[in-house]
Swiss-Prot record:
PTMs per UniProt: N-glycosylated. Ubiquitinated by the CRL2(FEM1A) and CRL2(FEM1C) complexes, which recognize the -Lys-Xaa-Xaa-Arg C-degron at the C-terminus, leading to its degradation.
Quaternary structure annotation from Swiss-Prot or TrEMBL: Interacts with HSPA5.
Subcellular location, record wording: Endoplasmic reticulum lumen
Protein name: Nucleotide exchange factor SIL1
Encoding gene (name): Sil1
């Protein structure tokens, strides 16, 4: 039985206790119902998400950040934090204040660098750099499209080349429409020979044809082609023309065709060219015609011992002697002396070469030995003729005569010693070239032209003592 003496305030009624219990249960149920809405996620995941969000915000802030470009001058100025310094500026830290200071190094460099900077835009540190993504993309395209690009470039190059050149058939067709014919050298020479050999051609046309023909026969193959279709004989027959101009230019063509062309030289001898050339030199002809004929004769005789034999048999030395003695043909004297010098030395070199090589079948040497040139020169009085030519006033002519005198020395030694005029001429020339050689030495020329001539004269005088 409950005590009766307890106060009423300390007594809990059963109804109140029941109400408190119901309130607690209701609160617990509501908490359990909303637990899913307010439950915590994985702590690590939340930390990473928070970090990524922070970095993203920082990048966005960095991307949207606008850097202020500092404009330095010639004086030191304080650099504020966040300011961009143009390239070429001088930056230092003030040890007293602890702040960075900037000034302009060179005004020109500063002005050039500021060209790329604009206010209100982000500073571009290096506009020529590439990102890693750019490089990866370019490399992928390069690997995929190299072969395709190469083939396209090659096709483009071929197309460009084709545009520069046109097919020969197309050109021929257009030339045919223009009445222009593409000719080979052979066809041109045939046309020129026909023009020269035509009775309907005028003198001017014949001379023009020969003049053009001389240009082509300088080539060895063309000269032999001229021989193959009979054009060479037509030109040789032109030496019989009554027109001096035709003789002159026919000899001009022959001289070019004979030069260093043995096959043409042989055919010319068989075609009677040598006889015709000597006849022109022996008769009264204009000097220009004789010059061209002498040129053709020299081309025919050089390096052709059989032609030299025939030249001696046909009285060639007598013809040349008469030519040199003509007063109107003195200009040809040096050319004649040069020809004789070439023929004498050519034979000497052939004999020396045969001895050095010890050729078992010296056919060429045998041909040269049959050329009795030196005895013929002595018999025809060429020892005296060459000595007289030493009196020519030209230095070049004297040089060639001195060379010829030296080549003929073994044959003409006695004649030279008995020639008083030659002795006086050599003495006079010795004094003249001593003075000229002294002038050369004063000008610093140790091996001058006149010194060489003086040496030749001294050597010849020594041999004749």
């Amino acid at each position: 039985m409950a005590p009766q003496h307890l106060p009423s305030t300390r007594m809990a009624s059963p109804g109140m206790l029941l109400g408190l219990l119901l309130t607690s249960c209701l609160t617990l149920c509501l908490s359990c119902q909303n637990s899913n809405n307010f439950a915590l996620t994985n702590p690590e995941k939340s930390i990473h998400q928070e970090s990524d969000t922070k970095e993203t915000r920082e990048e966005e802030e960095l991307d949207t950040e606008i850097l202020e470009v500092f404009h330095p001058t010639q004086e030191w100025q304080t650099l504020q934090p966040g300011q961009a310094v143009p390239a070429g500026s001088h930056v230092r830290m003030n040890l007293q204040t602890g702040v960075n200071e900037v000034k302009l190094q060179q005004e020109d460099k500063f002005q050039n660098n500021l060209k790329g900077f604009k206010r209100g835009r982000r500073l571009d540190i290096n506009a020529n750099t590439y990102t890693s993504q750019d490089l990866k993309s370019a490399l992928a395209k390069f690997k995929e499209g190299t072969e395709m690009e190469n083939s396209k470039d090659e096709l483009a190059r071929q197309a460009t080349v084709k545009q520069l050149f046109r097919p020969i058939e197309e050109l021929k067709k257009e030339f045919d429409e223009l009445n222009v014919v593409l000719e080979t050298d052979m066809q041109i020479m045939v046309r020129l020979i026909n023009k020269f050999n035509s009775s309907s051609s005028s003198l001017e046309e014949k001379v023009a044809a020969l003049f053009d023909l001389e240009y082509y026969v300088h080539q060895m193959d063309n000269a032999q082609d001229l021989l193959s279709f009979g054009g060479l004989q037509v030109v040789i027959n032109g030496l019989n023309s009554t027109e001096p101009l035709v003789k002159e230019y026919a000899a001009f063509v022959l001289g070019a065709a004979f030069s260093s062309n043995p096959k043409v030289q042989v055919e010319a001898i068989e075609g009677g060219a040598l006889q015709k050339l000597l006849v022109i030199l022996a008769t009264n002809q204009p000097l220009p015609a004789k010059k061209k004929v002498l040129f053709a004769l020299c081309s025919l005789l050089r390096h052709f011992p059989y032609a030299q034999q025939q030249f001696l048999k046909l009285g060639g030395l007598q013809v040349l002697r008469s030519l040199v003695q003509e007063k109107s043909a003195k200009v040809l004297a040096v050319r004649v002396v040069t020809l004789l010098y070439d023929l004498v030395t050519e034979k000497m070199f052939a004999e020396e070469e045969a001895e050095l090589t010890q050729d078992s079948s010296p056919e060429k040497l045998q041909q040269y030995r049959q050329v009795q040139l030196l005895p013929g020169l002595q018999e025809q009085g060429w020892c005296e003729i060459t000595a007289q030519l030493l009196a020519l006033p030209e230095h070049d002519a004297r040089e060639k005569v001195l060379q010829t005198l030296g080549a003929l020395l073994t044959t003409c030694r006695d004649r030279y010693r008995q020639d008083l005029q030659l002795s006086r001429t050599l003495g006079r020339l010795q004094a003249e070239y001593q003075a000229l050689a002294s002038l050369e030495l004063q000008e610093g020329e140790d091996d001058g032209y006149f010194r060489e001539l003086l040496a030749s004269i001294n050597s010849l005088m020594k041999e004749l003592r």
